[in-house]
């Protein structure tokens, strides 16, 4: 079985104006995460080279904040061009919040292949986890990305206290969008966050993967944040459940599995790694 590996780079971290209860980058909570307006282009390129060395096909440029303004758009485009020049075979993904069709077209011109903007949860449950922007604005940004000609990467976070009905509604919304890839994150409570919910069991997490793939058979289901903590020794069962991709290395503000360990284990299990996108 061939799977896709993706890596992410947090190129602008923290001080986000939004009050998302699950996020340590929100200015509404006190955390000890690193905060910076921009990462040096040379460091981004170095991380991209390391991602490629670790068999990654996708490389995501992530910025904290509500969305793109002119300055941030220019910076992300600069980063994309720098990575493309030095590591031409990576598929570049941008994750920069709310964006207009015109802004997204600029990202595409700069070499961005796919835009990631998660709905996070259902329309009904969203007001319980964020009050500073609407679920509808997130949905619209996804429509904008499609109109701009970008591939769509859209998923969310499970384990925030949502009901099974919420999960079903969430998947129905994803079906409307039909994203190219669908990231699944499992919420891990942090003492600094307002949101404190019990950790999902491995069985429940694997059921979420199965249900997502059943709802979105044409999408690449990507298991991301919380994989190592929630699933532990069962984490590679995600591929039997329908996943076709994982995020390797560190996440935005938390440590992930050492990429070399993932690669060794996956090769031992007979997996190969996608080197191009079909």
UniProtKB/Swiss-Prot annotation:
The coding gene here is bioB
| A single GO BP | biotin biosynthetic process
Q: Which organism is it from?
A: Campylobacter jejuni subsp. doylei (strain ATCC BAA-1458 / RM4099 / 269.97)
Mind telling me which SMART domains this protein's record contains?
A: BATS, Elp3
For activity, the cofactor(s) needed are:
[4Fe-4S] cluster; [2Fe-2S] cluster
Specify the protein name. Biotin synthase
- Tell me the pathway: Cofactor biosynthesis; biotin biosynthesis; biotin from 7,8-diaminononanoate: step 2/2
Sequence similarity:
Belongs to the radical SAM superfamily. Biotin synthase family.
Q: How does this chain assemble?
A: Homodimer.
